[in-house]
UniProtKB/Swiss-Prot annotation:
Protein name stated in the entry: Sulfur globule protein CV1
Highest rank taxon of the organism: Bacteria
Quaternary structure annotation from Swiss-Prot or TrEMBL: The protein envelope of the sulfur globules is composed of the three different proteins CV1, CV2 and CV3.
Function according to Swiss-Prot or TrEMBL: Structural protein of the sulfur globules, which are intracellular globules that serve for sulfur storage in purple sulfur bacteria.
Keywords linked to the UniProt accession: Signal
Alphabetical list of InterPro entries matching this protein: SGP (IPR035173)
Leader sequence segment: 1-25
Taxonomic source organism: Allochromatium vinosum (strain ATCC 17899 / DSM 180 / NBRC 103801 / NCIMB 10441 / D)
Gene responsible for this protein: sgpA
Family: To C.vinosum CV2 and T.roseopersicina TR0.
Length: 127
């Protein structure tokens, strides 16, 4: 009798276990794919996704200028200051400035300067 009760108990346990497993799979509990936990997940924090920090931008502009010259820059014929660009003939502050044929003036040398104007006597302050 005890042996038959054990066999019956084991058979009932297997029957209930099988029924619960099939019910979980049929009704779609967590992990079975019916979307029951789509919004909360299993709350273990082991999700997946795609992340990208690329960004871009652009802009548009519109404006009007004061067209001077013949299309090559400000002033004729080819840029700021004739004939070839910034401060003819060779660049800013010719002959040794920016764009000079062999570079700027060596260190320690002073560029040529205008002589100082004579000092004017200062007028006495009025009372």
């Amino acid at each position: 009798m005890i042996k038959s009760n054990r066999i019956t108990a084991c058979a009932l346990a297997a029957l209930f276990a099988g029924a619960s497993f099939s019910a979980s799979a049929w009704w779609g509990g967590p992990g079975y794919g019916n979307g029951l936990w789509d919004n909360m997940g299993d709350m273990f924090g082991d999700g997946y996704g795609d992340f990208n920090m690329s960004m871009g931008g652009g802009g548009r502009g519109y404006g009007r200028g004061y067209g001077r010259g013949n299309g090559y820059g400000y002033g004729a014929p080819y840029g700021y200051g004739a004939p070839y660009g910034y401060g003819a003939p060779y660049g800013y502050g010719a002959p040794y400035g920016y764009g000079a044929p062999y570079g700027a003036m060596p260190y320690g040398a002073m560029p040529p300067q205008m002589p100082a104007a004579p000092a004017q006597p200062q007028a006495a302050p009025s009372r």
